[in-house]
Each structure stands twice: as C-alpha cells, then as structure tokens.
Amino acid sequence: MRVARVNTQSAPTVTARLDLLDTLESEAIHIIREVVAEFERPVLLFSGGKDSVVVLHLAAKAFWPARIPFSLLHVDTGHNFPEVLAFRDATAERLNVQLEVADVQGYIDDGRLIERPDGTRNTLQTTPLLDAIAGGRHDAVFGGARRDEDKARAKERILSLRDSFGQWDPRNQRPELWNLYNGRHVVGEHVRAFPISNWTELDVWRYIERENIELPSLYFAHRRDVYARDGMWRAVSRVSAPREDETVESRLVRYRTVGDMSCTGAVESSAQTVAEVVREVAASTLSERGATRADDRISEAAMEDRKRQGYF
C-alpha cells in the first residue's frame, strides 16, 4: 500500500521590492489622485522650475491616457528668467493644459502693491496668489515644495490647511498617519497639497534622469555674466545690476533653483547633462535654497514668515 507523503516545507515566499524612486512616485501619484477625488477645483502652481515640472509629469502619469483634470497657475513677478517663461508656455501648450497667470506688475501699476526698496519681488507674490486662488474658487492647490528645502517646509504637512485669509498656522496642523490625508475644510478655506514633500533634491534629479524629463536650459552649465554678492553669483540682468564696487565676470554657471533674477544666485558648475548634475548634487552639502536664494536670508524664519502670510 502506498502512503501519501505530506510536504511539510513551507512554500517559497516571493517578495517584490520597489526601489526608492518607484516608492516615491507611487506615493506622489496616490496623493494627486486623492486630492482630485476629494476636491472640486484643484490647481497646480507651475513656474517651469524642476519641482513643478516633476509634479506635472506625475499628474500626467496619474491620469493617463486622460487629460490632466486641472489647470496650471503661475504668479509672474516680472523678474522671472525669460528662458523659464518660454519653457512654461511651451509645456502648457504641449500638454494642452490651461495656464492662468497672476501678474505682480499689474498690482504695482494700479497701486495695490508697492515696490520694495531693494527691488526684489519675491514677497510681493502672496497677494496675487491668494487673489487668483479666490477668483478661481480653487479649494486645493498643488505645489512642488519639499521638506529638505527649508526647516519651515520640513514641518509642514503634505495636505496643509490654509484659513479664509490664506494663512498657515504651523501650531495648528492636522496629524497625518501613514497614507491617510485629511482634506476637510469649510467654504473660504483651501488646502495646499505637496505630492513630492518627501523627495530630496537628489531624488528629483534621479527621477528626471530616469523619466527623461525636459527642463529649462538654466539648470545646466552655460556661460553668463555674473557678479559676486553675499556669497552668490548674481546674473547681470535688467532687474539685477552690480554696484560700483562689484565686478562683472563671465563664468560657467548653472542654477539649482530658478526663482526671480533679482534674488536667485547661480553656482559655478560644468555639469551639462542630467547625469552630471546628479553626481554634482550627490556631493553637495547645502540645499539649493540655502545655497542660492537671497530671499531666504532675510532672517532665520524668512520662509516661515512668508508661508504664514499665504506664500507657497
């Protein structure tokens, strides 16, 4: 008589691991879909900078093959790099996405805003931004902010509530457990959503390399007339001129972040490809904002002060 033998060995366990970029992409797409499902009129802040370009790319993947189900919004200070504005417009046209532009210069011309003595306009963006959000009845606003950029952004939630004045209260934030996001709000309030909050600058560049994402040319090494101020190379432009004691030099530089010409510094670099930028960023010990943004050096709490008033 034959006796059936029972296999007492457990079946082999099959595990599948996502690499870091896959995990970050999956989280970001989940956040984008969650916001679109929960809110009525979301909008994406799109400047043409690398972070907003990545968020837009993620949104396209999240809803492919359908169109991106929300519009883009940019606050144009009048001090933006021309190359970035051209890229912004071309990208919106290529993806067939509506682009709304809030114009700081218009606010200055009609007296609603006053030009700052130092000539910079970064802090002047808040009023046009909040007006555009209210005028468009946007209840959710996507942004490309990341926690590794600044200590104020490091403590902000992925879904961050703004009150009826557009203000952020860092002492009154909601808990976020795992992938559970609370978007509840009343009429007049809105929520800022940051899908790549957990990404680092290096993650962004590695993702750009993997996905072959196109960026403005300013992110790569090019020769430009610059002058040294406050430890940064500032570009010579119509809104940023050297003082009498500052010398103009022609140097090979690139931009790690593309804010206003009047407050954004370049870094010396020979990186002309994404792979070369990845290697450069991997060796860096300063965040891009800490290294190149004069507007963040006004005070230790410069970013938090602006965010409390409604800034990005």
Roles of regions detected by a PLM:
Residues R2-F312:
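Nucleotide-activated chemistry modules centered on ATP-dependent adenylation/adenylyltransferase
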